[in-house]
């Protein structure tokens, strides 16, 4: 009972410290939100249409029909193209400046030759490959309507479990807030104890310093769960995030052992490095790197081969690989092997806490304190 009282006392003290030292909460709030904003803005969270120019020099009925086919082409989200220029001179200028994905020209002899001219700024980028595929799709639809296509195909571009890119980024930002918050808050609180000499007082308490570590774990997990509601709410309100109560509750309950493991890692790093200026950049880089290469930015199966190989050995990638599908209702449960790993992550967190405080006490004794 006394040990539980000690853990709760440390937790209450930690909450007061975080209330006064608000800079400790800046990183787990700002880093996921900044990444979420950048991903949504840069990688098409606002829609699917690419800026292109189209010029019709034929002015024939056939060319007008093809023009309309380009303008009417669309995905299940937005139109394929955003036609921002129809003047030939301006289109060439903007294309050479890299302000257009594509310049489509219907020449004067279009009716006779049935040729169109396509000019791109960078033919090798993934965006250019995507926009050329859209052109082919549009031309196939046009030819099918004209009865000139001998083989037709039906493209299924939407699946029942599809989500908006912005919604996927929103879910990833929730998971990033959870594991980054748990790790960095634990490290910050340990560094605070070290820099303010509180660790010596804790060592002399009847329950021992390890109870302080458990109190920090409790605070880190609790606060990270609360902070994650910020990106979750923003995603629901603005990013087309579909909220599934059961799935979200399952994720929040199941991820607690992972958060304990992350808090244990934070305490271990705090015991080793001790100072904010070393701890914070290191943990932030771990979080951002995991987000990009571990399934937060895109599914691991969509990454390049080298990235997939790194993700296979980078243990933190399971946070996004396993929890994102449940969060978006792609899956409704975790497998037995996943549950076993999640449980072991919690055990590892407690083990690292023992090691961290054992290491701290040993250094204090040999340091003459």
What are the language-model segments listed below?
Residues 209, 213-283, 288, 336-343, ...:
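Alpha-helical transmembrane segments and their short interhelical loops
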Residues 166-188:
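Long, hydrophobic alpha-helical segments
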Residues 39-46, 187, 191-192, 238-243, ...:
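Short helix-capping/hinge motifs at transmembrane helix termini and TM-loop junctions
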Residues 9, 68, 300-340:
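Short hydrophobic, aromatic-rich alpha-helical segments embedded in or entering the lipid bilayer
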Residues 1-164, 369:
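Extracytoplasmic/periplasmic domains immediately adjacent to an N-terminal transmembrane anchor
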Residues 2-4, 45-46, 268, 272, ...:
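Junction motif at the cytosolic side of a transmembrane helix
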